Regions:
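Long, charge-patterned amphipathic alpha-helical coiled-coil/hairpin "stalk" segments used as oligomerization
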Residues: 103, 108-214
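Alpha-helix N-cap/loop-to-helix initiation residues
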Residues: 92-93, 185, 222
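A generic "alpha-helical surface" signal
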Residues: 64, 151, 224-228
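Small/polar loops that bind or transfer phosphate-bearing groups
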Residues: 87-88, 180-181, 218
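Intrinsically disordered, compositionally biased charged tails
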Residues: 1-19, 239-304
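N-terminal cationic and glycine-rich segments that engage phosphates or anionic surfaces
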Residues: 5-82, 88-89, 93-136, 147-150, ...
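Residue-level signature of catalytic and energy-coupling elements of molecular machines
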Residues: 29, 85, 177, 229
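Short glycine/threonine-rich loop/turn motifs
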Residues: 188-191, 195-247
Length: 304
């Protein structure tokens, strides 16, 4: 284990309500930022140090900011409001769709349509058209059309489903958006800021955190990191929905990385200054996490 991790283990920490442990964040590779040459100076406050020219994110701050973000979305959903999940790049798309749809929240996991927030009336027209086509299919009316017309409508349906399918049940503008990679989703972030919609985001070391209402510093490229952070946010939304509408989120008691939080008995991490928080991580785990980061960065470049 490197000196960096030894130093990290012995850093004094404050007692806090923990949604997910630092160890779980570490094993998911959340601490791996980008290469130092891609570092954004505005992210310096969230960086613990560097290792092999890779910026290492301070997971104590990640945990703290993630807990704050989780509390925020739970509060939003407890009032019957909606959080829109946004993650269109390859490493985020599947997770965003699976997690958001599991509790009926809106999401955008394909291409972000310009005007989704700033020109909602036009987007709503596309959503209405999607509902009309779905009604044609469910009622069997589409079978009465000639083959050419039916094929054209099916193509239109596929196109609309890809572009607005994740937000087809959204009745109006969301009360907050959760974003994976603010640099990649800059148009969505700009639209949210213009409309006064709070932005909660997973922000990597190469991004600009300015203008983001709630920054969760962390690896926004590796699938394991994205899945863990998104899962915490979704579970917090589920708790909010449960308290507002009697919604019962699916159980996740068997998850090895998420701690179950009971409202009556909150879990408090009490860490003495001399106690190590992060258990020793094997070289194999470190290398695997680094390779995952590099692979995701390569995929990111291919997407562009």
């Amino acid at each position: 284990m490197s000196q960096l991790y030894r130093d990290w283990r012995l850093t004094p920490r404050r007692n806090k309500l923990s949604i997910v442990s630092v160890k779980d964040l570490l094993h998911a590779g959340v601490h791996f930022g980008h290469q130092k040459k891609f570092w954004n100076p505005k992210m310096d406050q969230y960086i613990f140090g560097t290792r092999k020219q890779i910026s290492i994110i301070n997971l104590d701050l990640t945990q703290e900011h993630l807990s704050a973000a989780a509390s925020k979305v739970e509060d939003i959903c407890s009032k019957g409001n909606k959080v829109l999940f946004v993650g269109t790049k390859r490493s985020a798309s599947k997770t965003i769709k699976e997690e958001a749809s599991s509790i009926g929240l809106p999401y955008v996991n394909k291409r972000w349509l310009g005007g989704t927030l700033t020109n909602w009336k036009t987007i709503r027209g596309s959503i209405r058209r999607l509902h009309d086509i779905e009604e044609m299919v469910s009622s069997g009316r589409i079978e009465k059309l000639i083959k050419k017309e039916a094929v054209e409508i099916q193509k239109e349906h596929a196109k609309l489903e890809a572009s607005v399918g994740g937000i087809k049940d959204m009745k109006g503008l969301p009360d907050a958006i959760f974003v994976i990679d603010v640099k990649y989703e800059k148009i969505a972030v700009l639209e949210a800021k213009k409309m006064g919609i709070p932005v909660i985001a997973l922000v990597d070391t190469n991004s600009d955190p300015d203008g983001i209402d709630m920054v969760i510093p962390g690896n926004d490229d590796a699938i394991r990191s994205i899945r863990l952070i998104t899962k915490v946010i979704v579970e917090s939304c589920a708790r909010g929905l449960e308290s507002s509408k009697g919604f019962i989120p699916k159980s996740d008691k068997d998850s090895p990385i998420i701690q179950t939080i009971k409202k009556e008995e909150p879990v408090i991490e009490e860490v003495a200054a001399e106690e190590p928080v992060i258990e020793e991580v094997s070289d194999e785990e470190e290398v695997a996490a680094e390779e995952s980061k590099v692979e995701e960065n390569e995929n990111k470049e291919e997407d562009k």
